[in-house]
């Protein structure tokens, strides 16, 4: 979903139709990615949080985005199978102020080591159960029904650590010039998304190509 399309009407229509990005019609056999068409090189490198010899791949996402929901199972499998020299991070975007609650919710899960337990559940609650979970209060009530005490969620949600991570996420989003989600950033140097590649299947192929380029010293 492109950044300019994040209106309630667009979200509602997309949710109804499902719009499974990874299931869109595939084109011809994969060809070598083309810079400027399949991916973009950043004008300024973005510092990464990984050590020497490691390659960072970032998924930019938003819980209420139907495309991100459709992509999540595929990306989770890709993340699990990533080579040892690839460090995969998820970064929730904040295109508008009302995105902040869900952005912070992800970092609450991360801080409490609950991403694996809660990340997919939150997507499911929003897109399959059609729950409106876009405020701190609504999210706190939801986690309270899913094994995390509301007070613990609220305390962590309002903590300095979560606020700092959310601020850093927005900085990364801006540094990569994210125009829509889901999107991928590679090695602090490259950016691709479904608008460039037409499908997120292809975006993952492009990310793998770029990982190879980084390994080869590009």
Predicted regions and their residues:
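Sec/Tat-exported extracytoplasmic proteins
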Residues: 61-64, 75, 79-82, 109-113, ...
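Solvent-exposed loop/turn segments at secondary-structure junctions
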Residues: 64-67, 94-98, 125-128, 161-162, ...
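C-terminal cap of thioredoxin/glutaredoxin-like
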Residues: 5, 145-218
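Extracytoplasmic/secreted proteins, especially bacterial periplasmic and envelope-associated proteins
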Residues: 56-59, 70, 74-77, 100-104, ...
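Structural microenvironment flanking redox-active thiols in thiol-disulfide oxidoreductases
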Residues: 81-112, 116-143
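Extracytoplasmic thiol/disulfide redox context detector
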Residues: 2-97, 212-218
């Amino acid at each position: 979903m492109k950044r300019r399309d994040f209106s309630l009407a667009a979200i509602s229509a997309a949710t109804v139709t499902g719009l499974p990005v990874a299931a869109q019609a595939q084109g011809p056999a994969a060809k070598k990615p083309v810079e400027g068409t399949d991916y973009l090189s950043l004008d300024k490198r973005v510092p990464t949080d990984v050590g020497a010899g490691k390659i960072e791949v970032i998924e930019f996402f938003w819980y209420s985005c139907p495309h991100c929901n459709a992509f999540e199972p595929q990306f989770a499998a890709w993340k699990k199978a990533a080579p040892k020299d690839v460090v995969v991070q998820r970064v929730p975007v904040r295109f508008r102020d009302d995105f902040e609650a869900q952005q912070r919710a992800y970092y609450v899960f991360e801080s409490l080591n609950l991403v694996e337990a809660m990340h997919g559940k939150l997507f499911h609650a929003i897109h399959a159960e059609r729950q409106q979970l876009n405020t701190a209060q609504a999210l706190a009530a939801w986690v309270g029904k899913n094994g995390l005490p509301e007070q613990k969620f609220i305390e962590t949600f309002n903590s300095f650590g979560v606020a700092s991570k959310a601020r850093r996420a927005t900085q990364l989003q801006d540094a990569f010039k994210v125009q829509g989600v889901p999107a991928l950033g590679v090695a602090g140097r490259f950016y691709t998304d479904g608008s460039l590649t037409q499908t997120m299947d292809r975006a993952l192929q492009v990310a793998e190509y770029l990982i190879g380029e980084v390994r080869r010293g590009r």
